[in-house]
Structures are given as C-alpha cells and as structure tokens.
Amino acid sequence: RFQRLTGGYRTFCRLTLAQARGVPGPRLLELGAGLGRLALYLTDRHPTARVTVSDIDPDVVERIRRGPVGSHPRVTPAVLDATSIDAPDDAFDVAVLTMTLHHLPTPGVVALLEEGTRVARRLLIIDGWRHPAYLAVAPLLWTTGGLPHLHDGLISLRRLYGAKALHALAGACAPTVAVRTRFAPPGY
C-alpha cells in the first residue's frame, strides 16, 4: 500500500523503462519482486515488454502465479535468488531490484551487483534515500500498515546503503561494476 499511495510504483516503472529506452520488446527481470506489482505497471506502460518477475521464496512466487500478475501473457514468474541468478549472460535488457537492497548483507550486495550485471545489460537498483529527513514518512508507514509496517520501515531506514558504500561494494566486485547514484523523487 505504501508504494501505491506514494507513487512509488509509477516512479519505479518510469525509471525502469528509461533504462530500456530504444529496445524493441525489452526483456525485463524484476528481482526480489514480492507480489510483483511493478510487473503490471511495466506491461501496462510498454506494449511489448516481457517481464520475468522473481523472488527467492517459492511460496511468494506461487502467489504471483495464481494472481493477476501470473496470468498476464507477457509475465513469467520464477523462483530466483538475486545473488545467484539461474540465467545465461545477457539474458535480459534490464534487471531491476526495488526497495530490497537494504535487506541484503554486504556479501549479498556484492553478489547481486555481479549477478545482475552478468544476466542483464543494465542493472537498476532503487532503494530508499539514506537521510534523516526520510523519517518524515513514519506517520505514513503507520497509516498504511500499522505498527508492523512502522517497525519494519524504521529498521529499513537504518539499514539503507549510502552512495559511498555502494561505490565501495561495486569496487569489490569481480569484475568491478560501474555505479551511478542519484536521487529520484519522491525519495528514492
């Protein structure tokens, strides 16, 4: 609910499709997709995009398969580990991970960067903005999900990777991964 209320999915979709600009029939990989709502935004806004929507949890992927995302003709649900992706090199034009990076430990981030850039021409990571002003969203977290959502949100805010950390982790990749960071309203 939080991403729908704040326009997050629209922002994620816009940023993802910008990475696929000029590619006819782009092959998109959504990593750590949860319920895969971004896949519906992507297929609604790009008439030829094909999306593999994935999560590490088989139960989550089964829920995707049984729902509106899984029944879409241009969406393929898959159980995938974002740190060890079972796909050939350059299988996708864009791989995208949204609001999940902060859940990975440091070695997992390095593995994600290596794997994401191996299987896709571009890897787009969208996560929260590490800044004290981000605490202003606490009331919205409470409103959209109650105490559990507020608790998870505040912990997530503390675990966000900053730009310096991402550049350092990209330098630890083999081969080194080029990283560009920027702020994208409403707070990513």
Segments and roles (model prediction):
Residues 96:
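A conserved beta-strand element that flanks and buttresses the S-adenosyl-L-methionine
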Residues 128-174, 179-181:
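C-terminal alpha-helical "lid/dimerization" subdomain adjacent to the S-adenosyl-L-methionine
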Residues 120-128:
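Conserved beta-strand signature within the Rossmann-like core of class I S-adenosyl-L-methionine
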Residues 104-115:
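A short, conserved alpha-helix within the catalytic core of class I
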Residues 100:
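Hydrophobic adenine-recognition pocket in adenosine-nucleotide-binding enzymes
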Residues 1-11:
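Class I SAM-dependent methyltransferase Rossmann-like catalytic core
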Residues 16-23:
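Glycine-rich helix-loop-beta junction characteristic of Rossmann-like nucleotide cofactor-binding loops
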Residues 29, 35-84:
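Class I SAM-dependent methyltransferase SAM/SAH-binding core
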